Regions:
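Conserved phosphate-binding elements of NTP-dependent enzyme cores
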Residues: 1-301
Length: 301
């Protein structure tokens, strides 16, 4: 931690910005590294309005899709109306937070699910506008998650899918109650959303509910969600630093994480992992061992 998080990363950041290095770092040679991404386990904000759907960009696609429906146009509803933060369809009781605070005398306030919307964040009118969804065709199901969004859209146009051939119709609050994998299976007519959901699923986050608040995620879940936006980019010159990403993970989830890290490397990235997990160490190209002991008791390489 001292070597990487308190020395290497701040020194690289200072070097890229043309600023003075940290006092204890005498020299650094970035080599081919051009940028640093620190993927730690800190919560994704403290705002309960941030959810898996908003952070991943899925909600933006859904809002535009709902606004394009005839039922929405008849009511004069645009994409902004489907936002639970500011839209006209949000629950008026909780203002779209999905919960209310009870003032308990002599004790801290207690947050409970909103009695009117049941935690869905939306009012009754939102349930009246329903989006047709189709089962994901094999052609889209085989997308590797690396196709660009416009390629997925072009592929969808070539698939014979009549407007009447819908497998389900759901309102926005009902969709946000689904898991990533459940919505992925029904995203055949929304290929751009399917690509985003496929990425989350490949990151081992398919069990997360779309409407789940991001501050409630575990450290490992937060790390992988932060990675979602990086998985489609070329990573030449990028350094990713992970601080003990396997903490709390099941061995199967460690395997998923290893595949994710390998994908970053295949795209040209360099990955540094601060870790004690033997599977992670065994899969590394290089192992730098510091110690014995830690802090002032260690330091030998």
């Amino acid at each position: 931690t001292t070597l990487i998080l308190e020395s290497l990363v701040p020194a690289l950041v200072a070097s890229f910005a043309g600023k003075a290095l940290p006092a204890h770092v005498h020299q650094i040679d970035p080599g081919d590294i051009e940028r640093v991404h620190l993927i730690d386990s800190t919560p994704i904000g403290a705002n309960i309005r941030s959810t898996v759907a908003t952070y991943s960009g899925v909600l933006d696609i859904l809002r535009r899709s709902f606004a394009a429906l005839p039922a929405a146009k008849e009511r004069g509803l645009k994409a902004g109306a489907f936002s639970y933060n500011t839209g006209s369809l949000r629950c008026p009781t909780c203002d779209g937070t999905g919960q209310i605070s009870l003032d308990v005398q002599f004790l801290p306030d207690v947050d409970i699910p909103c009695p009117d919307c049941g935690g869905s964040r939306y009012g009754k009118e939102a349930y009246q506008i329903r989006l047709p969804l189709q089962v994901l065709p094999d052609e889209l199901n085989e997308l590797d998650g690396e196709s660009e969004q416009d390629e997925a859209d072009e592929l969808a146009k070539s698939i014979d899918a009549p407007e009447t051939a819908h497998d389900d119709e759901l309102s926005l609050p009902e969709i946000l109650a689904l898991t990533v994998d459940q919505l992925l299976a029904l995203s055949g007519n929304l290929p751009s959303m399917a690509v985003k959901l496929r990425t989350l699923s490949e990151l081992g986050l398919g069990y997360l509910t779309l409407g789940e608040a991001t501050p409630a995620l575990s450290g490992g879940e937060a790390q992988r969600l932060k990675l979602a936006g990086e998985m489609h980019k070329k990573q030449q010159g990028a350094l990713f630093v992970f601080d003990e990403p396997t903490i709390g993970l099941h061995p199967h989830d460690v395997e998923v994480l290893l595949r994710v890290l390998q994908r970053l490397i295949d795209k040209g990235a360099t990955v540094i992992v601060i870790e004690h997990d033997l599977d992670m160490i065994a899969n590394s190209d290089y192992v730098i061992d510091l110690g014995p002991g830690g802090g002032e008791a260690g330091g030998k390489m």
